[in-house]
Regions:
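C-terminal binding/interaction regions
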Residues: 96-171
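Structural motif
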Residues: 23, 56, 80-82, 116-122
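Glycine-rich phosphate/diphosphate-binding loop of Rossmann-like nucleotide-binding domains
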Residues: 12-57
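Active-site rim loops that border cofactor/substrate pockets in soluble metabolic enzymes
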Residues: 47-76
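Short, ordered loop/turn segments at secondary-structure junctions
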Residues: 28-29, 86-88, 122-128
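Conserved active-site and cofactor/substrate-binding residues in soluble primary-metabolism enzymes
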Residues: 17, 32, 36, 40, ...
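Glycine-rich phosphate-binding loop
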Residues: 65, 69-107, 111
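SAM-dependent methyltransferases
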Residues: 1-21, 166-171
């Protein structure tokens, strides 16, 4: 929920570059692949001066549980950003693209309702098989998504910091 001091639900004195906490909420399915993305995210953040111990890892059973946990975390006021990570694959029982769409739509609602930025690292491949070639491809791809998420988090938080710091124009 937005605070009186900031339209973004956090104290503007605590952008990520100044030590604000980031929640990384991840699904447990395909943990090794999602872990690779989270590790790449943390490494990219550390390269830019954000310590790894300021990133809280929160696990949920599957992707479907991520939005509610993200909303509960945003409501604590402890986080300047939340990153969601999952690999949503076609298990042959239901349409995985529906699950991924539902999760991403819910994550968008969380950030709009709480004004805490939420970032998606949900991969939804058309085809995924448990063999070495696919696993290696998606491990590498999730690492790329982790680095991209770090860029997005830092860019967004810097934009918010500048917006909060900008002089107000009388209406």
């Amino acid at each position: 929920m937005p605070s009186p001091s900031s339209p973004f639900g956090h104290n503007p004195a605590h952008p990520a570059s100044a030590g604000g906490r980031i929640a990384f909420v991840q699904a447990c399915w395909h943990r090794d692949i999602v872990d690779a993305g989270r590790d790449a995210f943390a490494a990219a953040m550390a390269e830019r001066g954000h310590p790894a111990d300021a990133i809280d890892r929160i696990e949920v059973p599957g992707a479907f549980e991520i939005p509610l946990r993200a909303k509960l975390l945003a409501a604590t006021g402890r986080y300047v950003a939340i990153v969601a990570g999952a690999l949503v694959v076609d298990g042959g029982i239901y349409r995985h693209d529906f699950v991924a769409s539902t999760v991403v739509d819910a994550l968008m609602r969380v950030q709009l309702e709480t004004c805490v930025p939420v970032f998606s690292m949900l991969l939804t491949p058309h085809h995924f098989h448990e063999h070495g070639t696919h696993r290696e491809f998606f491990l590498a791809h999730m690492r790329t998504k982790g680095r991209e998420a770090a860029d997005a988090v830092l860019g967004t938080l810097e934009g918010h910091r500048l917006l909060v710091a900008a002089p107000r124009v009388a209406a």
